[in-house]
Swiss-Prot record:
One of the primary rRNA binding proteins, it binds specifically to the 5'-end of 16S ribosomal RNA. One of its GO terms (cellular component) is cytosolic small ribosomal subunit. The keyword Iron does not apply. One of its GO terms (biological process) is translation. SUPFAM superfamilies: Nucleic acid-binding proteins. Pfam families: Ribosomal_S17. Keywords: Ribonucleoprotein, Ribosomal protein, RNA-binding, rRNA-binding. It comes from Synechococcus sp. (strain JA-2-3B'a(2-13)) (Cyanobacteria bacterium Yellowstone B-Prime). Part of the 30S ribosomal subunit. This is Small ribosomal subunit protein uS17.
Length: 83
């Protein structure tokens, strides 16, 4: 079975070794045809605590690590600049 991947933005890194990643999905409304942006949040494992809020990351599906965590951060695609 292929490994599922998603790309999203880190919206929270307040937990130890865990980040919340918001993934946008654009779908057409079935009746009206308007493109609607749907956002879903995934908890992902970040072993080294490298991710900051605003980073663009790729997450991959993994075995369940906790009750709500089934994804892990594969790589950071774009880091946010720190002031």
């Amino acid at each position: 079975m292929a490994v599922r991947e998603k790309i999203g933005i880190v919206v929270s890194n307040k937990m130890q070794k865990t980040v919340v990643v918001a993934v946008e999905n654009r779908v057409a409304h079935p009746k009206y045809g308007k493109i609607v942006v749907k956002t879903k949040k995934f908890k992902a494992h970040d072993e080294e605590n490298r991710c900051q809020e605003g980073d663009l990351v790729r997450i991959t599906e993994t075995r369940p690590l906790s009750r709500t965590k089934r994804w892990q951060v594969a790589e950071i695609l774009r880091e946010v600049k720190k002031l």
